[in-house]
Amino acid sequence: MEEFQRYIELDRSWQHNFFYPLIFQEYIYGFAYDHGLNKSILLENAGHKKYSLLIVKRLITRMYQQNHLILSANHSNQNDFFGHKHKKNLYYQIISEGFAVIVEIPFSLLLISSLGAKEKKIVKSHNLRSIHSIFPFFEDKFLHLNYVLKILIPYPIHLEILVQTLRYWVKDASSLHLLRFFLYEYRNWNSLITPQKYISIFSKKNQRLFLFLYNFHVCEYESIFVFLCNQSSHLRSTSFGALLERIYFYGKLEYLVKVKTFTKDFRLILWLFKDPFLHYVRYRGKSILASKGTSLLMYKWKYYLINFWQCHFSLWSQPRRIYINRLSKHSLDFMSFFSSVRLNSSVVRSQMVENSFLIDNPIKKFDTVVRIIPLVGSLAKAKFCNVLGHPVSKSAWTDLLDSDIIDRFGRICRNLSHYYSGSSRKKSLYRIKYILRLSCARTLARKHKSTVRAFLKRLGSEFLEEFFTEEEKVLSLILPRNFSISRGLYRGPLWYLDIICIHDLANDE
């Protein structure tokens, strides 16, 4: 067992780094251990829950035996990759699931060690699982910041770069060779990491491996922030030379001049980027870097990020993937919300003997607004309304029971209201509710071959009214009694800490 320990042995310094398990938070939700290969086969003793490295090595050997069969079939019939087309997807699925299980182990052990060392702090960090926890953070921090960088994370243009960066985390050469063979032989590998092509065959049938590779790539991209903030790398060697060695290894010859310049001015770079008011947030392929500094500092960040992508990932990054916005003048489009910092005037009258004064105090307020046009477009695409937002019947659901139709519409309405509850302006939510409510009525009327007016007159509108006001009933239980909700939904922003992903209709990416 000791000879295999080095393959997934973690540096002890990692155990004190609590940041990286949080980076892989989204990746943890994506893994389904009970799908495909059972997690129990990786346990040496299920009672003690210890990973058996010997069993892991046997899995690698077993997959290599399967790999030999694939190669034999390939040589026997060049036109048919596996010899039998109906077995093609099955073999790919087995290899991808097996490899995903193997490469997950080091990161799982890293997470477990971090959770054990930070057990008391983890209890307070459960709410970080919710993506809504980002917006209270914005409300608290963005009022004191000036500029924000909106970054679209680039995806790797060549899979060899992805495999080579992975080798610094996973030291098992055999499994990496297997991954390289699997990726290069797969017919649809060009759309592996592209965010806009989630519907590809690979991402549908190999979600476990797809999520791991994409989140690993994002983690590698985020390593530059951790390195510059801590002045040390997350690699096994904490010296800056380790990062430079990797840049030299990946960078093409024409980029080495820039890398040397980066090395020469490294101390100056650390001084420039040592900003105590720098904040970083990411969700999927979009990230935000906000700072209290000047526009010059943000332009330097943009310059060094572009050079880092070009040198480290050997790709050309378009400057348009990074936008610099001033918070006081521009809205931030993030996670299906328009967020901005606006000034509210507070006029105070001051009376002094015979004279009175009016004092105007500007107060900053963080404002979040629903992106109504893309949301209506998503509803139109789902056949709930037309492109102008006029409700239409959902013809595909007319064969369902009345209770099922109402339940489906009600669930969508509640989920959207639940997600957009943090909006500062509720008028857009009322419009979405109106579209779904009338679409439900039109669907029921079409099913019963009647008009909407006659249908509602016969059954009454209360059956829909009571159903769609369930959100108000929930709010009456969780809000203090001094909040009056008899006039309608609570108008202030309300963030829920149980939302881990964007609703499909709200996600227009």
From Swiss-Prot:
| Classification via InterPro entries | Domain_X (IPR024937), Maturase_MatK (IPR002866), Maturase_MatK_N (IPR024942)
User: What is the predominant subcellular site recorded for this chain?
Assistant: plastid
Q: State a single Gene Ontology molecular function.
A: RNA binding
Keyword Membrane in record:
no
- Per the record, the domain of life is Eukaryota
Query: Could you tell me where this protein is found in the cell?
Result: Plastid, Chloroplast
Keyword set includes tRNA processing: yes
* GO terms under cellular component: chloroplast
Question: Pfam families, per this entry?
Answer: Intron_maturas2, MatK_N
Keywords in UniProt for this one? Chloroplast, mRNA processing, Plastid, RNA-binding, tRNA processing
GO biological process, alphabetically ordered: mRNA processing; RNA splicing; tRNA processing
Similarity field: Belongs to the intron maturase 2 family. MatK subfamily.
Against PANTHER family, the record matches this protein to: MATURASE K (PTHR34811:SF1)
What is the recorded function of this protein according to its Swiss-Prot or TrEMBL entry?
Usually encoded in the trnK tRNA gene intron. Probably assists in splicing its own and other chloroplast group II introns.
Record-given protein name: Maturase K
**In which organism is this protein found?**
Opuntia quimilo
Its ancestry begins with:
Eukaryota, Viridiplantae, Streptophyta, Embryophyta, Tracheophyta
Q: Which gene encodes it?
A: matK
